[in-house]
Swiss-Prot record:
<keyword id="KW-0545">Nucleotide biosynthesis</keyword>
<dbReference type="GO" id="GO:0006227">
    <property type="term" value="P:dUDP biosynthetic process"/>
</dbReference>
<dbReference type="InterPro" id="IPR018095">
    <property type="entry name" value="Thymidylate_kin_CS"/>
</dbReference>
<keyword id="KW-0808">Transferase</keyword>
<dbReference type="GO" id="GO:0005829">
    <property type="term" value="C:cytosol"/>
</dbReference>
<comment type="similarity">
    <text>Belongs to the thymidylate kinase family.</text>
</comment>
<dbReference type="InterPro" id="IPR018094">
    <property type="entry name" value="Thymidylate_kinase"/>
</dbReference>
<dbReference type="InterPro" id="IPR027417">
    <property type="entry name" value="P-loop_NTPase"/>
</dbReference>
<keyword id="KW-0067">ATP-binding</keyword>
<dbReference type="GO" id="GO:0006235">
    <property type="term" value="P:dTTP biosynthetic process"/>
</dbReference>
<dbReference type="GO" id="GO:0006233">
    <property type="term" value="P:dTDP biosynthetic process"/>
</dbReference>
<feature type="binding site">
    <location>
        <begin position="11"/>
        <end position="18"/>
    </location>
    <ligand>
        <name>ATP</name>
    </ligand>
</feature>
<comment type="function">
    <text>Phosphorylation of dTMP to form dTDP in both de novo and salvage pathways of dTTP synthesis.</text>
</comment>
<protein>
    <recommendedName>
        <fullName>Thymidylate kinase</fullName>
        <ecNumber>2.7.4.9</ecNumber>
    </recommendedName>
</protein>
<dbReference type="GO" id="GO:0005524">
    <property type="term" value="F:ATP binding"/>
</dbReference>
<keyword id="KW-0547">Nucleotide-binding</keyword>
<dbReference type="InterPro" id="IPR039430">
    <property type="entry name" value="Thymidylate_kin-like_dom"/>
</dbReference>
């Protein structure tokens, strides 16, 4: 069997990524289909990356500065947590990865996709996800969920305009190829979990992983 499997969960704020992962973690807290499972998040995942996360969530800054900090956090995350876990043949599931930087800083904050991709090239290296799952929902659902959780931060504020939300949603949709990147229906959170389990099971048992 190859060394580990790297899975990223993506989508706009309010789509239900974190709820999905918490539900999955409750059902499969330590392993899934024979893989020991490591759960993490971005920004964050290591002590230093979590300190950078606090800055990103609560300190106003220039969009380019924000892009650099995301890349710095990701460098620590990849090298200190993700790569070692993959070398130990674990299943690594991360709440957000590089696609979020492309969407938020590259598109919405207009730093530019090429600029953000260049910043993250060294941070990520060859450690791109084997599979990415994009949790999708409509604008009203996302807003209602963010309002109910009542934990406002600077990143949440980015997608409270429908035009920006639509831009991000369209970008995420453009990534879907149903081979490495899959779309999950986040409107129904119970159904989303079952869809994720079924699709992830298919991904982990395909011949290319053996």
């Amino acid at each position: 069997m190859k060394q580990g499997v790297f899975v990223a969960i993506e989508g706009v704020d309010g789509a239900g990524k974190t709820v999905l992962l918490e539900a999955f973690k409750q059902r499969f807290p330590q392993s899934f289909l024979g893989f020991k499972t490591l759960f993490s998040r971005e920004p964050g995942g290591t002590p230093l990356a979590e300190k950078i996360r606090a800055l990103l969530l609560h300190e106003a800054m220039e969009p380019l500065t924000e892009a650099y900090l995301f890349a710095a956090s990701r460098t620590e995350h990849v090298r200190q947590l993700i790569q070692p876990a993959l070398q130990q043949k674990q299943l690594v599931i991360v709440d957000r990865f590089v696609w979020s930087s492309y969407a938020y800083q590259g598109l919405i904050k207009k730093v530019g996709l090429d600029v953000v991709k260049k910043l993250n090239a060294d941070a990520v290296g060859d450690s791109m996800p084997d599979f990415t799952f994009i949790v999708d929902c409509d604008f009203e659902t996302a807003l209602n969920r963010m309002a109910k959780r009542g934990q406002d931060n600077l990143l949440d504020n980015t997608v409270k305009k429908q035009a920006d939300f639509n831009t991000m949603r369209q970008y995420y949709h453009s990534l879907v190829d149903n081979k490495r990147v899959f779309l999950l229906d986040g409107q129904n959170q119970t159904g989303c979990l079952e869809q994720f389990i079924e699709q992830l099971s298919q991904c982990l048992t395909q011949p290319t992983l053996s």
